[in-house]
Amino acid sequence: MLLSQTAASRMRRRGRGAILNVSSVASGTAMGTYAAHKTWVEIFSCALAEELRGSGVQVMALKPGTTDTGFFSKITTKIEDVPTIARLTPEYVVEQALNDLARGKVISVPSVIYKVMDFLTWKAPRSLVCRFTGYLQRDRFRV
């Protein structure tokens, strides 16, 4: 938050710039602290984008899905356990994020499969989302 606000202040004075905060398609799910933090990042980014509207500074929250990075070496789930269709490469995520930033989007969700998941996460009843994601993650994503 402090980095984004400091950067925003300097960029606003210059009249241009972009801030990209990394959220996750896991925001809004029952994945505990991780999901809560990623939801906060998304809401913060939306609020900051609104504050900076018309200043020449763009703000975007990137909500990638499963991306083949070092993240999976720190949790019990392995990247190989994720269906191939749901795995994203870092290069693809960056390309999609930059395209969305160029289009002025405030939220970027790379990949159709994750766009659908994100839509359902926020439109389905909270109790259903929490129960379903809690069930799926019961023995996974433990540090």
Features from the language model and the residues they span:
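Active-site "substrate specificity/gating" loop of NAD(P)-dependent dehydrogenases
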Residues: 3, 28-32
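A short, exposed helix-loop element centered on a Lys and neighboring polar residues
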Residues: 4-5, 46
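A short helix-coil junction within the Rossmann-fold of NAD(P)-dependent oxidoreductases
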Residues: 6-15
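Residue(s) in the substrate-gating loop at a strand-loop-helix junction
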Residues: 24
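The catalytic Tyr-X3-Lys active-site helix of short-chain dehydrogenase/reductase
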Residues: 32-40, 44
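SDR active-site lid
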Residues: 49-114, 123, 127
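Short linear elements at protein peripheries
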Residues: 133-143
